[in-house]
Amino acid sequence: MLKKAMVAAAAAASVIGMSAAAAPQALAIGDDNGPAVANGNGAESAFGNSATKGDMSPQLSLVEGTLNKPCLGVEDVNVAVINLVPIQDINVLADDLNQQCADNSTQAKRDGALSHVLEDLSVLSANGEGR
């Protein structure tokens, strides 16, 4: 009885292992074209559409609609520790993206810079991908 259970468990484990081995592997291959950008793809915005009703309920007339989406585009700034040692964030594993204050926009990153180090190895590269 125990032998039959062990045989069934081993067979199930081998089937699961074979299906996992046959599944496509997620490798960083091929996507060298840079970030893909789509701006305002079917998006709509409405500003200044607030209303207050009743006595003594004023609107913010000077800034009405401008506080809906405040946006301050600030570049990366080097920060000095006690004004002695400048510290800078250098992206090694990822690419820089400088899309700030882009309303209704999407920027899809490409594969990271160091993800293509092993690209030319035949075991890890695009075997039969048809570049």
UniProtKB/Swiss-Prot annotation:
Cell compartment(s), UniProt: Secreted, Cell wall; Spore wall
CC annotations in GO: extracellular region; spore wall
Keywords from the UniProt entry: Cell adhesion, Cell wall, Secreted, Signal
Top-level taxonomic group: Bacteria
Described purpose of this protein according to its UniProt entry: Probably forms part of the rodlet layer on the spore surface; despite their high similarity both RdlA and RdlB are required for rodlet formation. Plays a role in cell adhesion to polystyrene plates. Does not form amyloid fibrils in vitro, unlike RdlB.
Deleted gene: phenotype: A single rdlA mutant does not form the rodlet layer on spore cell walls; disruption can be complemented by rdlA from S.tendae or S.griseus but not by any rdlB. Decreased levels of rdlB mRNA. A double rdlA-rdlB deletion shows no effect on spore germination, growth rates, differentiation of aerial hyphae into spores or surface hydrophobicity on a number of media, but spore surface rodlets are missing and cells adhere less strongly to a polysytrene surface. In the double rdlA-rdlB mutant chaplin proteins are still correctly localized to the cell wall of aerial hyphae.
Protein name: Rodlin protein RdlA
Keyword Secreted attached: yes
NCBIfam families listed in its UniProt record: rodlin_AB
GO annotation (BP), single: cell adhesion
Stated family: Belongs to the rodlin family.
UniProt induction comment: During aerial hyphae formation. Expression is activated by ECF sigma factor BldN.
Signal peptide: 1-28
Domain free text: The N-terminus of RdlA is more highly charged than the same region in RdlB; replacing 3 charged residues by polar residues confers the ability to form amyloid rods to RdlA and allows the mutant protein to form rodlets by itself, which neither RdlA or RdlB can do alone.
Principal subcellular localization: secreted
